[in-house]
Amino acid sequence: MQSQNIRIRLKAFDYRVLDASTQEIVNTAKRTGAQVRGPIPLPNKIEKFTVLRGPHIDKKSRDQWEIRTHKRLLDIVDPTPQTVDALMKLDLAAGVDVEIKV
């Protein structure tokens, strides 16, 4: 019989908030008796934007901005019902996007 896995993918702009949320999920899963694989750091997505500084002329004067999206992957192997309940009740930081696949 095939074991059931829960794959959790986290995304955030701030890596410190992301790492804290990841550690909170790992601690919750281990406390309820599940085995955790990860966190696996995935490649960062870097979006760069170049805008003109002035509203009129002077094309040589520009600002460059970038947004870095940090990602982590967690696998929870053979989760118990207590693990699923604890993860559903878990309250994470506001800046973290969570995707869950069963």
Curated annotation (Swiss-Prot):
Role according to the record: Involved in the binding of tRNA to the ribosomes.
Q: Name the encoding gene, please.
A: rpsJ
InterPro entries referenced in this protein's UniProt entry, alphabetically: Ribosomal_uS10 (IPR001848), Ribosomal_uS10_dom (IPR027486), Ribosomal_uS10_dom_sf (IPR036838)
Which GO terms of the molecular function aspect are on file?
structural constituent of ribosome; tRNA binding
Q: Name one GO cellular component term.
A: ribonucleoprotein complex
Question: Any idea which UniProt keywords this protein has?
Answer: Ribonucleoprotein, Ribosomal protein
Q: Pfam families in the record, alphabetically?
A: Ribosomal_S10 (PF00338)
Provide the assembly information: Part of the 30S ribosomal subunit.
Quote the HAMAP family the UniProt record gives: Ribosomal_uS10
- Set out the biological process GO terms recorded for this chain's protein: translation
Family statement: Belongs to the universal ribosomal protein uS10 family.
**Bilayer-crossing regions:** none
Protein name as it appears in the record: Small ribosomal subunit protein uS10
